[in-house]
Regions:
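Gram-negative bacterial Sec-dependent N-terminal signal peptides
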Residues: 1-30
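Outer-membrane beta-barrel "beta-signal"
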Residues: 396-414
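Detector for outer-membrane/organellar transmembrane beta-barrel domains
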Residues: 223-358, 414
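Transmembrane beta-strand segments that form the barrel wall of outer-membrane beta-barrel proteins
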Residues: 100-111, 185, 230-236, 337-350, ...
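Outer-membrane beta-barrel proteins
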Residues: 49-53, 114-116, 144-148, 188-193, ...
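Outer membrane beta-barrel
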Residues: 31-58, 62-193, 209-227, 263-267, ...
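Transmembrane beta-barrel architecture of outer membranes
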Residues: 123-125, 165-167, 212-216, 253-261, ...
């Protein structure tokens, strides 16, 4: 218990106190605020990995974290039991000045970034929407979260756009067709590549240029048959060298992308999830794999470069990326269901990225889920992933996950 308490840290304790206080408010004013809800679930995942991935990512299958050199993370085989998917949230809705106000705050325990591998507070949603205006952190306008399949593995298909991002959004229309536009927080992922080898100091000082927000938009049409969505993004992707005169070398490029997605209903409950995304400099918005910009030799320059690197020999270029997702959710009856599908990401690397740079990833899964009650889910899932590097080295991973999920809502106790 002491070890887990230390890993959770003060952020989770403060968050627990916050939602606990909100829960008491909800209990005291249930009749006055019927649209206030406290919700969440406790989930435990048992994962048996037959190969190995980066130990910080044992509890998720990310192709980008699969080693392409045997033994990088030890012998094959790894067991993990995790509660990181467990979730807690609050949401409220009421009319103000004739327009609906919706507010949501939600977190889980899946550490990422500097907290990767830890069971710790991770903010998912923190936003409000009053009428057509939304402000805060939630799903990117470039993303279609509804194509996420009925799977139990946390990270999900590699080839879909998936990013919860701080944004300011405006939505037009309230019928079956809606158009949304937003400015979103920029977050360039720059790969110095082989610059780190020929000039370590230069490579260490390259930083992303995030001087302008990303511009996103989508059109979505919804019907009894499902929905279709077409989304686009324009963004400034660039880099600069901190500590250097005039911050040079530096460069910027236009990043852009198009994301076409759809859910198609089949029969009473079955759903086909489809998605195809293509663009340049959009890896930051992908669920897994790739980088926005990489180094490329200027025209007429041959490799290898001399040391120090001659001025103008290298430039940054945005990387083309293709992502595909196809899944089928089937319901055997009211209690049993399955989801099966495949996803991929393909990156067109620049000529001066390192040989170990990520270039291709695959993700596939199939499951059987039992839901005796809407608040209870028990299921097993077979997963496979593969990574391919710029130098054509490959690595794959095979694993089985068994999960138990128990959900709750304050509405269940009224």
């Amino acid at each position: 218990m002491g070890t887990l308490h230390g890993r959770l840290g003060p952020r989770l304790l403060m968050a627990t106190a916050l939602v606990g206080g909100l829960g008491m408010v909800q209990a005291a004013h249930a009749q006055d605020a019927p649209n206030f809800e406290v919700y969440g679930f406790a989930q435990v995942d048992f994962t048996q990995d037959f190969n190995r991935v980066d130990p910080a990512w044992d509890d998720a299958l990310r192709p980008s974290k699969i080693p392409t050199t045997q033994g990088t993370f030890g012998d094959n085989g790894q067991t993990s039991i995790s509660v990181k998917q467990s979730r807690f949230g609050v949401k409220a809705q009421q009319d103000i000045a004739g327009k609906p106000l919706f507010v949501q705050f939600e977190f889980d325990l899946f550490g990422v970034g500097g907290d990767a591998g830890q069971t710790t507070f991770r903010l998912r949603h923190a936003y409000g929407q009053w009428g057509p205006v939304l402000a805060g952190q939630t799903n990117s306008v470039f993303m279609d979260g509804d194509i996420f399949p009925n799977t139990i593995e946390y990270w999900g298909p590699t080839g879909m756009v998936f990013l919860r991002n701080p944004q300011i959004r405006y939505t037009f229309g309230s019928g079956p067709g809606q158009f949304a536009i937003a400015v979103e927080k920029p977050g360039n992922d720059i790969d110095p590549g082989n610059i780190r080898t020929v000039s370590p100091e230069l490579g260490a000082n390259i930083r992303g240029d995030e001087s302008l927000p990303d511009l996103t938009g989508h059109y979505r049409y919804q019907g009894d048959w499902g929905h279709v969505q077409l989304a686009g993004i324009l963004r400034r992707v660039g880099y600069e060298t901190v500590g250097a005169t005039d911050n040079k070398p530096k460069n910027t490029k236009l990043g852009w992308g198009v994301n076409a997605t759809s859910n198609i209903k089949v029969g009473a409950k079955d759903v086909v999830h489809l998605g195809v995304v293509y663009g340049e400099g959009i890896a930051s918005y992908m669920n897994d794999g790739g980088t926005d910009m990489g180094p490329e030799a200027a025209t007429g320059v041959t490799l290898p470069l001399p040391t120090p690197v001659p001025p103008g020999s290298l430039r940054g270029d945005v990387l083309p990326l293709l992502g595909l997702t196809a899944y089928y959710d089937h319901y055997w009856n009211d209690q049993w269901s399955s989801s099966v599908g495949w996803s991929m990401t393909k990156v067109d690397n620049t000529d001066f990225q390192e040989a170990t740079a990520y270039t291709y990833g695959q993700y596939a899964s199939a499951n059987l889920l039992y839901t005796p009650d809407p608040r209870i889910l028990i299921g097993g899932e077979l997963l496979w992933g593969e990574r391919k590097d710029f130098n054509d080295n490959k690595g794959d991973d095979l694993r089985v996950q068994v999960s138990f999920k128990y959900s709750f809502s304050s509405k269940d106790f009224r």
